[in-house]
Structure formats: structure tokens, C-alpha cells
Amino acid sequence: SASHVEIPLFGINLGTVGFLTEGEITNWQTIIDRLLADDYSMQDRMMIRGTVRTGDGKECRKRALNDIVISRAGFSRLIGLDVYVNGSFLNAYEGDGIIISTPTGSTGYNLSAGGPIVDPMARLMIITPVCPHSLTSKSIVLPSDAKVSIEIAKKRKTQDTEAIVSFD
């Protein structure tokens, strides 16, 4: 929610992986000293924007540094998602959902779902299906200026007709 302010972020690894974090919590004093001494470099990371349109016409617009995830609302059913890129149909996915990831987010949920790790300074997006009910569903890498549209497919009664969208 603070993405429009353009305040630099500094990642500190509090867990066990920390692919893109610059510091470890055990070195917090050194980190603070370097920041106060202007002894650091900055990287401009790509963000993605998304718009959620509900059935009753409401819209919600947000930005994400890591990813936008569309997932099923129910626990026991698949969700069908039709994906379009620049207005052209790309694929129909059935599964637990879809991740639209930035290069920064490629080492997070995207990686856990089997997606590729990409250079954090690259200008691209990754679409990765989450637990696809298919033998051939793989991640797709797109240019950063591609317009991705996703619609809930209503092909079978056993599919969810609602989704949960998260911006990270």
C-alpha cells in the first residue's frame, strides 16, 4: 500500500532462505551503521499492477513487488482460469490458482510452485500455475509490458466460481 510513496526498502533475512535480502538479523548493528553512513547501493525493482473486477462491477487496483496470486476460494474444488495476453487467449488452467510474478518474486511462491528463478533486474513477468490438474502446464515468461487478463472459467459445476486475489 506504500508503493506510490517510492521509499527505498531494505530486506533483512529473518528466516532461512533470504534469496534477495541484503542483511542478516544477526548483523543489525552493522546494517544500521552502513545505512546511516550512506554506505549502500540501491536497485530499482519492477512492480506489477493489477485490477480486480467483481461480478457487481466494483474495481480494486493494487501494486505488487513480488506477485499477484489468484487462487480458489473453496477447499475441495479446482478453479478454472482462462488467461489472455494482450487480448489473445493463452491457455485455460485448472488447479489451485495462478501466480503472476515479478523477477523479485521469482524466488518466493513462484519458486515453490515450480517456476523459474530469474535475474531480479530483468524486465519480465512469470505466469506459474499452482498445482495444475494437467501434465503439461508450465510457467510462461512474458515481457514486462504484456497485459495479462484472467477470467474465472465456468465450464463445470464442480469448479469454483469465486476466487481469492492477493497482492504481495
Describe each PLM feature range:
Residues V17-D96:
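Catalytic core of DAGKc-family lipid kinases
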